[in-house]
């Protein structure tokens, strides 16, 4: 390791300082450290130094400088996730300033389509909402095994997928919510189908759901008025008198037929008299 001229640090030491300051969130101090570096092309082309410059440029809102750094140098795959976040977040911020409102999911998708990741920080693999299919495959496989990973397991998944722990946590939370919603929808459809089946079974096959008519006409006959009841009673008594084999009061079996007819007229008068009086009273 050779010391940098008039600086006192080796290139590896400079890279280590950049990484430590980034991880500690000391971005202003990192910016001052980068400004103090000597004008050495070999040093300024170091990937850790370039990444540190990109982080400082984003922190200060110097997005043009950020884009220039990311597009001008080929970065190693292990640095792609961090630099991709810087690229996308910078374009999101610029779009929000132009529109004057925060971006939703559709707005962010349009920004990603308009400003695709440069190949210097992207290996060309298709991504879905900034997640590579390979990373999503790892998460899906783990979800099938355990939908509730522990904090330690989330950190391990983040390292394996190149995502942050927050991204991993959000992915699992969103996936659980989608599965619960799908289960609730399926349960609702099943209950609706069962309810429809039960109602169909209760319907009469002949009457389309209407109750079968009773064979007894009396249940559905209209109520008879007092007058109608009296007339029916009279007709029944008269018919009974004609067909009965018993002797009527005051008559013998040997009486002539005209005597029987006269007695029937008397019987009608005796029955119709009170009935007529009742009808007159009801009508008055």
UniProtKB/Swiss-Prot annotation:
Q: Name one GO cellular component term.
A: nucleus
List the biased-composition ranges (Basic and acidic residues).
Answer: 179-190
The residue ranges flagged as biased composition, category Polar residues, are 242-271
User: What SUPFAM superfamilies does the annotation carry?
Assistant: Homeodomain-like
Q: Which CDD domains match?
A: homeodomain (cd00086)
Region (Disordered): which ranges?
168-271
Gene3D superfamilies, A to Z: Homeodomain-like (1.10.10.60)
List the Gene Ontology MF annotations in alphabetical order.
DNA-binding transcription factor activity; DNA-binding transcription factor activity, RNA polymerase II-specific; RNA polymerase II cis-regulatory region sequence-specific DNA binding; sequence-specific DNA binding
**Alphabetized UniProt keyword annotations:** Activator, Apoptosis, Cytoplasm, Developmental protein, DNA-binding, Homeobox, Nucleus, Phosphoprotein, Repressor, Transcription, Transcription regulation, Ubl conjugation
Q: Which GO terms describe its biological process?
A: apoptotic process; branching involved in ureteric bud morphogenesis; embryonic cranial skeleton morphogenesis; embryonic skeletal system morphogenesis; epithelial cell differentiation; generation of neurons; inner ear development; inner ear morphogenesis
What subcellular locations does the record give? Nucleus; Cytoplasm
Q: Which residues bind DNA?
A: 124-183
The record's SMART domains line, in alphabetical order, gives: HOX (SM00389)
Q: Per the annotation, which location comes first and is thus the protein's main one?
A: nucleus
How is this chain modified after translation?
Answer: Phosphorylated during interphase; becomes hyperphosphorylated during mitosis. Hyperphosphorylation impairs binding to promoter elements.
Q: Name one Pfam family in it.
A: SIX1_SD
Cross-referenced InterPro entries, in alphabetical order? HD, Homeobox_CS, Homeodomain-like_sf, KN_HD, SIX1_SD
Q: How does it assemble?
A: Interacts with DACH1. Interacts with EYA1. Interacts with EYA2. Interacts with CDH1. Interacts with TBX18. Interacts with CEBPA. Interacts with CEBPB. Interacts with EBF2.
Quote the PANTHER family the UniProt record gives.
HOMEOBOX PROTEIN SIX (PTHR10390), HOMEOBOX PROTEIN SIX1 (PTHR10390:SF13)
Q: Which family is this protein grouped under?
A: Belongs to the SIX/Sine oculis homeobox family.
The record describes the protein's role as: Transcription factor that is involved in the regulation of cell proliferation, apoptosis and embryonic development. Plays an important role in the development of several organs, including kidney, muscle and inner ear. Depending on context, functions as a transcriptional repressor or activator. Lacks an activation domain, and requires interaction with EYA family members for transcription activation. Mediates nuclear translocation of EYA1 and EYA2. Binds the 5'-TCA[AG][AG]TTNC-3' motif present in the MEF3 element in the MYOG promoter and CIDEA enhancer.
| Name under which the protein is recorded | Homeobox protein SIX1
- What is the originating organism of this protein? Lagothrix lagotricha (Brown woolly monkey)
């Amino acid at each position: 390791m050779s010391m940098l001229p008039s600086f006192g640090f080796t290139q590896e030491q400079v890279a280590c300082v950049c990484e430590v300051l980034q991880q500690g969130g000391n971005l202003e101090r990192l910016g001052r450290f980068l400004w103090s570096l000597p004008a050495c092309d070999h040093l300024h082309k170091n990937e850790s130094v370039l990444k540190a410059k990109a982080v400082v440029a984003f922190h200060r809102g110097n997005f043009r400088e950020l884009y220039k750094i990311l597009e001008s140098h080929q970065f190693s795959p292990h640095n792609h996730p961090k630099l991709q976040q810087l690229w996308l977040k910078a374009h999101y911020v610029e779009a929000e300033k132009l529109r004057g409102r925060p971006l939703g999911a559709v707005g962010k998708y349009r920004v990603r389509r308009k400003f695709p990741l440069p190949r210097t920080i992207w290996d060309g693999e298709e991504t879905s909402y900034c997640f590579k299919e390979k990373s999503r495959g790892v998460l899906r496989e783990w979800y099938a095994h355990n939908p509730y990973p522990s904090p330690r397991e989330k950190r391990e998944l983040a390292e394996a997928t190149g995502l942050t722990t927050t991204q991993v946590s959000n992915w699992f939370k969103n996936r659980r919510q989608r599965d619960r919603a799908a289960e609730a929808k399926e349960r609702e459809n099943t209950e609706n189908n069962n309810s429809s089946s039960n109602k169909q079974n209760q319907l009469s096959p002949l009457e389309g759901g209407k109750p079968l008519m009773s064979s007894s006409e009396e249940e559905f006959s209209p109520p008879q008025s007092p007058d109608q009841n009296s007339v029916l009673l009279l007709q029944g008594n008269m018919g009974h008198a004609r067909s009965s084999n018993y002797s009527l009061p005051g008559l013998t079996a040997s009486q002539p037929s005209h005597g029987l007819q006269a007695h029937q007229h008397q019987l009608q008068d005796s029955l119709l008299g009170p009935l007529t009086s009742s009808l007159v009273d009801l009508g008055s």
